[in-house]
């Protein structure tokens, strides 16, 4: 296993950190067998990679052994954004049979947090992500880690996210507030449904709390609103904490709206 140092970890304010704790809690309500989770978005620059990274940090801080798999093989921004020193091998090296899985894994300077970086851009990203090697890799990581978070490309651009989502336990869609139309989000949702992907919920990102006072007004307020989808479930009260990441689980917990001001692009 390689060792890498992440030099640019964002300092989050209280509300932002609490929002990720809420997202972390909501995912736990999705079920104990939901361990391999992919994140996608409609378009680039909605904050998908930032949400993936900060979710992993939150999980790691809670004591969960967590690994972030950078499956954006076409245009990864992870290593550059967080100023990690260059890894020797990445996901594309492993999927193309050049190295063993352990060689592609990186132990970071954050306790409980490992990363598999994307590696060099391959000529056939979709084929690699849809192959047996990627599926088998996720099963191996499932046995080793409490959570496997997979950062995938925007689904509005390429089909890779649907390919990955179909073999994960569930998918979270990151949507930039005020930038993406309802119809566009529904189109992405339809693509995921077609491949049998379980959609765990949606993170509403980059919410302007001044223009959207709703998210700030109910900060710290507990509420529950069960929205069953044909599955058995009980109403749970979740905490409405912040104004930039909204999340809700797949019919197993209450609808929750949270927010985290100032998320980066990616």
Model-derived segments and their meaning:
Residues 1-266:
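P-loop NTP-binding module
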């Amino acid at each position: 296993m390689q060792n890498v140092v992440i030099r640019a970890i964002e300092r989050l304010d209280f509300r932002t950190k609490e929002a990720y704790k809420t997202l972390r809690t909501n995912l736990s309500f999705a079920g104990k067998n939901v361990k391999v989770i992919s994140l996608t978005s409609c378009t680039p620059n909605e904050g998908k990679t930032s949400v993936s990274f900060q979710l992993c940090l939150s999980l790691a801080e809670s004591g969960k052994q967590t690994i972030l798999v950078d499956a954006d093989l076409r245009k990864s921004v992870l290593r550059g954004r967080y100023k990690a020193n260059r890894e020797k091998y990445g996901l594309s090296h492993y999927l193309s049979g050049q190295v063993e899985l352990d060689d592609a894994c990186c132990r970071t300077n954050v306790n409980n947090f490992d990363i598999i970086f994307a590696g060099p851009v391959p000529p056939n990203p979709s084929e690699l992500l849809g192959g047996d090697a990627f599926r088998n890799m996720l099963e191996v990581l499932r046995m080793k880690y409490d959570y496997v978070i997979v950062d995938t490309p925007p689904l509005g651009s390429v089909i890779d996210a649907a390919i990955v989502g179909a073999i994960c336990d569930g998918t979270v869609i990151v949507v930039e507030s005020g930038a993406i139309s309802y119809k566009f989000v529904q189109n992405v949702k339809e693509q995921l449904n077609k491949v049998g992907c379980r959609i765990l919920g949606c993170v509403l990102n980059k919410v302007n709390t001044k223009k959207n006072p709703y998210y700030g007004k109910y900060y710290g307020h507990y509420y529950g609103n069960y929205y069953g989808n044909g599955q058995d479930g009980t109403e749970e009260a979740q905490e409405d904490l912040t104004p930039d990441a909204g999340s809700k689980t797949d019919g197993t917990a209450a609808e929750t709206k949270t927010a985290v001001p100032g998320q980066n692009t990616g």
